[in-house]
Amino acid sequence: MRRFVPPVIACLLVGLSTAPVVRAQDPPVAAAAAQAYSFSTGAGLLFFYVRPDRTADFEAVVARLSEALDAAQEAVRRQQAASWRMFRSVETVKESAIYVFSFDPAVPGTDYDPVKLLAETVPTEAQALYDRLKASIVKVERMGLARLR
């Protein structure tokens, strides 16, 4: 039995060293990340959990984004603005104020990422707005929706 083990180990090592290396492909991951805030089902929600002491910053950034989308020249951006509803939870939550962005109908294949939209619509202000947004957000959750009725 002992004579059998070393040749088997040697064969396994040779086999592993000559086997093709399979690596995860970057494009699917990048594509998934790029579409993280799009809603192929035609409707969706984004939940923003915001630090209670930073709600004014968050709301200021959202107001600026809303203004920029309303003033956009591109028809797609105006469509986004028309169906984008923003809500703030009235319930008190210990760790976060919760904001809900509703997109119904969501423009198919369109990205609703606020950071990307700020960079596109107000490029000279984008970094400062991003810094305020980043400092205010605890986490973001996305939910695609399927219409039942």
Protein language model features and the residues they cover:
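Generic signature of intrinsically disordered, low-complexity segments enriched in small/polar residues
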Residues: 7, 40, 61, 90, ...
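Bacterial N-terminal signal peptides
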Residues: 7-17
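Sec/Tat signal peptide C-region and signal peptidase I cleavage site
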Residues: 18-24
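An amphipathic, aromatic/His-enriched active-site/gating alpha helix that lines ligand/cofactor pockets
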Residues: 25-28, 67-83, 94-96, 102-149
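N-terminal secretory signal peptides
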Residues: 26-83, 87-89, 142-145
